[in-house]
UniProtKB/Swiss-Prot annotation:
Biased composition (Low complexity): 41-55, 307-317, 341-353
Protein localization: Nucleus
Renumbered residue ranges of the record's region Disordered: 37-68, 101-127, 255-406, 431-502, 568-623, 644-691, 705-758
Coiled-coil stretches: none
Protein name per its UniProtKB record: Transcriptional activator FLO8
Lineage of the organism: Eukaryota, Fungi, Dikarya, Ascomycota, Saccharomycotina
Residue ranges annotated for the LisH domain, each copy included: 73-105
Biological source species: Saccharomyces cerevisiae (strain AWRI1631) (Baker's yeast)
Source species, domain of life: Eukaryota
Residue stretches of biased makeup (Polar residues): 270-285, 318-340, 371-396, 460-480, 584-593, 660-675
Main localization (coarse): nucleus
Length: 799
């Protein structure tokens, strides 16, 4: 008979086929004993837990009635509900609720549907004492609770509830602030202890936190042993730096992190001296460091604001330039290319200036030839001239410099030069001539009084004396500088007297609308016209065209090629730009040479010139436009149909110019200079007869006046009687001077200009608010018999 070993019974007898081993039997026996002991321990633990639970349940409760009420909250609520129902005269409801909730009644109160409370079951709790209120404590409690709940949830509430809620919030904020400052002070104290800088000072957390935040308060620590200077010894094994994240102060030096070492501690435990002793470049994480603006240094990379004088990353001799803080450097696209300028060179360093003074002769000539760049007009962009460097076949945009070397000869000139520097323009006052509109205010008038040397060699004159910077294909910073010598293929005329037109235009916005005048005789130059102060005899102020902050742009009439000039009509075709008269045979040497005396050749050629037209259109969107025209000893043709020219007031002749609807215009009621037959206006916006205006004693324009003052070279007024005329009281306009009715009889003979180049003062004609239309601006057609180069001084659009 064989026995089968069962794994579930290890103590079973093994079969006879298998050898019996005493060691295996012992192991099985020990495991059985361990299991038995474990089961007994588990039973004992369970019994102990049950006993503890029974003891907790069987513990005697507190004999205090208040404690019983708190432990039995539901019964208390039921009692208050029963009290509320009783005081609300709901007796049947209260009796039914008391019966269902098993509530006892008062001793003196008999139940409605049952015996007294003594006969009730003993398990029911006795009726506890309820706060006696007229309408029931539950109702009053609920009323207060609901009022405060509405106040806290922004649903209204009574005034007292709102005041109470604000007081509670204020107390909570103060506690929160004090708690946060105490935590902050504890962190700082802990950090000081770890660094060995704390000597068991009694510190108020509020004072310490305020002190570390930089607020001026009373000293938080009472100094002990002031005369002693203990050396702080860091604790061994502890890190020196702080690892806590203190409130978010911006670190002035982000490269210094947790590896920075704290500076030497102050002599005592006063924390007021720790913050200021820190270096800006060395920060300890955890100390409040404010981000003050750092001073620029030479190691300042791109991106940090730095003064131009502190760094010089250029590879050439170019010295740093201080640009204005509120203005950007003008790009070549921001400037027109049809404006000449006077000679000026960019600033050079001391070494280059010394070399330029020492070297002369052939070496200097060769250097000038090598550095000369031919400036050509761009094919598509009228505002960005292109330069062609010697040896290259590509044209690159020219970068126009704005460095001034010339020094004017008066304080007024210095002021104007400083204004030109602010706008980033070049000096145009060092070699320019005077203008009749700038007499007494322009430095060019003072400079023109000095005797100038006659230049015999025209090759020495330079019309492209502005520095240009070209960028090659490899991206190098090579600078090509135009010297004072003109290119060999450039022809420059030495005519001193050339009329010019100054238009106040925005160079950036009206770049594409600028008159594309590309010169094939002289190179274009960039300059800025000086700010002039001219007497405005009209009641409306003057506003620049297009831009209110940029200087006027001066353009010579001779810098226009034949491609843009119509010889038949004498007009210039420009896209949405101003149209100006042109004389392609006359070149300009300076934009301010409009008032120089006429030479003998110009005097002889007065009768040989073809009449030209000046068609001026104001910019789109201007509600008020003023046209200031300055003429000198010229003839005005009021219309093409009128062939009889009328002289300006020379020798007693009276200026007669009529303003009205132009018969040549097909644009509606746009008023221009018209024939003398149109004398009666048909609307408020139409023109008036100037002759009738001069001979009248009152103003015809509602808000305007006409002023014409003809003076002799001796600055004596030929007008016998000038009366002051004021405008309407509704408009705050300045009073103007209007000639009286006898102006025609009191005009004396005026000295005419001869070959001796006598100074002849200009005659000012100002037309204001002529033919204004609501949607589109007017067109002004001014026909000039171009018999003198200096007749047409300038046209200034202000609107």
């Amino acid at each position: 008979m064989s026995y089968k070993v069962n794994s579930s019974y290890p103590d079973s007898i093994p079969p006879t086929e298998q050898p019996y081993m005493a060691s295996q039997y012992k192991q099985d026996l020990q495991s059985n004993i361990a299991m038995a002991t474990n089961s007994e321990q588990q039973r004992q633990q369970q019994q102990q837990q049950q006993q503890q639970q029974q003891q907790w349940i069987n513990q005697p409760t507190a004999e205090n009635s208040d404690l019983k009420e708190k432990m039995n909250c539901k019964n208390t609520l039921n009692e208050y509900i029963f009290d509320f129902l009783t005081k609300s005269s709901l007796k049947n409801t209260a009796a039914a609720f008391a019966q269902d909730a098993h509530l006892d009644r008062d001793k003196g109160q008999n139940p409605i549907d049952g015996p007294k409370s003594k006969e009730n079951n003993g398990n029911q709790n006795t009726f506890s004492k309820v706060v006696d209120t007229p309408q029931g404590f539950l109702y009053e409690w609920w009323q207060i609770f609901w009022d405060i709940f509405n106040t806290s949830s922004s649903r209204g509430g009574s005034e007292f509830a709102q005041q109470y809620y604000q007081l509670v919030l204020q107390e909570q904020r103060q506690e929160q602030i004090y708690r946060s400052l105490a935590v902050h002070a504890a962190r700082l104290q802990h950090d000081a202890e770890r660094r060995g800088e704390y000597s068991n000072e009694d510190i108020d957390p509020m004072h310490l936190a305020a002190m570390m935040l930089g607020n001026p308060m009373a000293p938080a620590v009472q100094m002990r042993n002031v005369n002693m200077n203990p050396i702080p010894i860091p604790m061994v094994g502890n890190p020196i730096v702080n690892n806590f994240s203190i409130p978010p102060y911006n670190n002035a030096n982000p490269t210094t992190g947790a590896t920075a070492v704290a500076p030497t501690a102050p002599p005592s435990g006063d924390f007021t001296n720790v913050g200021p002793t820190q270096n800006r470049s060395q920060n300890v994480t955890g100390w409040p460091v404010y981000n003050y603006p750092m001073q620029p240094t030479t190691e300042n990379p791109v991106g940090n604001p730095c003064n131009n004088n502190t760094t010089n990353n250029t590879t050439n001799n170019k010295s740093p330039v201080n640009q204005p803080k509120s203005l950007k450097t003008m790009h070549s696209t921001d400037k027109p290319n049809n404006v000449p300028t006077s000679k000026s060179t960019r600033s050079r360093s001391a070494t280059s200036k010394a070399k330029g003074k020492v070297k002369a002769g052939l070496v200097a000539k060769r250097r000038r030839k090598n550095n000369t760049a031919t400036v050509s007009a761009g094919s598509t962009n009228a505002g960005s001239p292109n330069i062609t460097t010697p040896g290259s076949t590509t044209s690159e945009p020219a970068m126009v410099g704005s460095r001034v070397n010339k020094t004017p000869r008066s304080d007024i000139a210095t002021n104007f030069r400083n204004q030109a520097i602010i706008f980033g323009e070049e000096d145009i006052y060092s070699n320019s001539k005077s203008s009749p509109s700038l007499d007494g205010a322009s430095p060019s008038a003072l400079a023109s009084k000095q005797p100038t040397k006659v230049r015999k060699n025209t090759k020495k004159a330079s019309t492209s004396a502005f520095p240009v910077e070209s960028t090659n294909k490899l991206g190098s910073n090579s600078v090509v500088t135009g010297k004072k010598r003109s290119p060999p293929n450039t022809r420059v005329s030495r005519r001193k007297s050339t009329p010019s037109v100054i238009l106040n235009a925005d160079a950036t916005k009206d770049e594409n609308n600028m008159l594309r005048t590309f010169s094939n005789t002289i190179a274009p130059n960039i300059h800025s016209a000086p700010p002039t102060k001219t007497a405005n005899s009209l009641p409306f102020p003057g506003i620049n065209l297009g831009s209110f902050n940029k200087p006027a742009v001066s353009s010579p009439l001779s810098s226009v090629t034949e491609s843009c000039f119509d010889p038949e009509s004498g007009k210039i075709a420009g896209k949405n730009g101003p149209k100006r008269a042109v004389n392609s045979k006359v070149s300009a040497s300076s934009p301010l040479s409009i008032a120089t005396p006429r030479s003998g050749d110009a005097q002889k050629q007065r009768s040989s010139k073809v009449p030209g037209n000046v068609v001026i259109k104001p910019p789109h969107g201007f509600s008020t436009t003023n046209l200031n025209i300055t003429l000198k000893n010229s003839k005005i043709i009021t219309s093409q149909n009128n062939t009889v020219s009328q002289e300006l007031p020379n020798g007693g002749n009276i200026l007669e110019a009529q303003v009205g609807n132009d018969s040549r215009s097909s644009k509606g009621n746009r008023n221009t200079l018209s024939t003398p037959e149109e004398k009666k206006p048909s609307s408020n916006n139409q023109g008036y007869d100037f002759d009738a205006l001069k001979n009248s004693s009152s103003l015809l324009f509602p808000n305007q006046a006409y002023a014409s003052n003809n003076r002799t070279p001796n600055e004596n007024s030929n007008v016998a009687d000038e009366t002051s005329a004021s405008t309407n009281s509704g408009d705050n306009d300045n009073t103007l001077i209007q000639p009286s009715s006898n102006v025609g009889t009191t005009l004396g003979p005026q000295q005419t200009s001869t070959n001796e180049n006598q100074n002849v003062h200009s005659q000012n004609l100002k037309f204001g608010n002529i033919g204004m239309v609501e949607d589109q601006g007017p067109d002004y057609d001014l026909n000039l018999l171009d018999t003198n180069e200096n007749d047409f001084n300038f046209i200034n659009w202000e609107g």
